[in-house]
Design a protein with these regions (language model features):
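Catalytic core and acceptor-binding pocket of nucleotide-sugar-dependent glycosyltransferases
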Residues: 149-258
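A residue-level signal for conserved active-site and pocket-lining positions in enzyme catalytic cores
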Residues: 35, 87, 106, 141, ...
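A structural signal for well-ordered alpha-helical segments within the folded catalytic domains
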Residues: 26-29, 33, 81, 85, ...
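Charged, often glycine-rich, active-site loop that binds/positions anionic groups
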Residues: 57-78, 204-222
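GT-A fold catalytic core of metal-dependent nucleotide-sugar glycosyltransferases
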Residues: 65, 79-136, 140-145
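Short loop/helix-cap segments at secondary-structure boundaries that form the rim of catalytic
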Residues: 51-59, 114-119, 247-248
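N-terminal anchoring/stem segment of glycosyltransferases
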Residues: 1-75, 95-96, 145, 149, ...
């Protein structure tokens, strides 16, 4: 049925390895618990494919399945193509009715983002001022529903770009490369903490620094994540090795309870303050 509420839409394919799959469903459940607390009026949409097994009891309101004839192994070998094609199909569906935030599975939502939607942008992105990284991180993308044809064209172009890349980038990073390419691969090394409004190809962008809307905990000299309180960012993104701190942060800092329970999706029962 069509969505009647703002939504968080999370793309995730079930990994072929059973242990890894369970771990990522645990991440999903932790992420969902933070959304239920900070954004109780929002829906949670899982974006996946027809080859993915979705566990019973997963905390989501809608499961959107993009049709595939490939094996799951083949899908993971072209994961970025699978992702952006799923985005493309989702935003062409009747589930896209209200303000929507595309999110990765490995993040915690600390603040309601929907007051950011003021009708003045079509796509909202988060940029980094670190020149060693891709200009944009695709873990948080804001999508306004006011101009659906513009949104559809945007994701068509993202798909076209990703499919033009070689196998390495079709498997990883191609989404971020395409997003940056559509803005001519900008350099924001001196831009932070500015919030930037920009128009290109009839599409209105709003760009937030990652430290405000898509923050990752710092790494030490040995590239190990540093556990620390980060209360200001709207979203905490536990990329890479930081994933090992996600449950700890939810429990110790955000006050959630987590109990191992093999009978629930992800193997952890997550509860806490509302």
């Amino acid at each position: 049925m069509p969505a009647s509420a703002p939504a968080f839409a999370c793309f995730h394919l079930t990994p072929p390895n059973e242990g890894t799959a369970q771990t990522y469903w645990a991440f999903f459940q932790i992420m969902a618990a933070t959304i239920r607390r900070t954004c109780p009026a929002a829906e949670i949409h899982l974006l996946t494919n027809t080859s993915s097994d979705v566990p019973d009891g997963l905390d989501c309101d809608q499961v959107f399945r993009h049709n595939t004839t490939r094996s799951q192994k083949e899908c993971f070998e072209r994961l970025m193509v699978e992702e952006v094609e799923c985005w493309q199909a989702y935003f062409a569906s009747d589930l896209f009715q209200e303000a929507t935030v595309l999110i990765d599975v490995d993040l915690l939502v600390q603040k309601d983002p929907f007051d950011l939607f003021d009708g003045e942008f079509d796509i909202g992105l988060t940029y980094t001022d670190d020149p060693a990284l891709h200009p944009f991180n695709s873990g948080v993308i804001f999508v306004d529903p006011s101009r659906p044809a513009v949104i559809s064209r945007y994701f068509d172009r993202v798909v076209e770009r990703v499919k033009s890349y070689g196998p390495e980038f079709q498997e990883w990073y191609g989404d971020q490369m395409a997003i940056a390419a559509l803005l001519d691969d900008p350099d924001y090394s001196e831009a932070s903490p500015a919030v930037i409004d920009q128009t290109k190809d009839d599409l209105n962008y709003r760009l937030w620094p990652t430290e405000q809307r898509n923050y990752s905990l710092p790494l030490d000299a040995e590239n190990k994540p540093i556990f620390m309180v980060a209360a200001e960012p709207g979203v905490l993104h536990f990329k890479g090795a930081r994933k090992g701190l996600m449950l700890r942060y939810a429990v110790e800092i955000l006050g959630f309870d987590a109990v191992e329970d093999a009978s629930v999706a992800g193997g952890w029962k997550i509860s806490g303050p509302v």
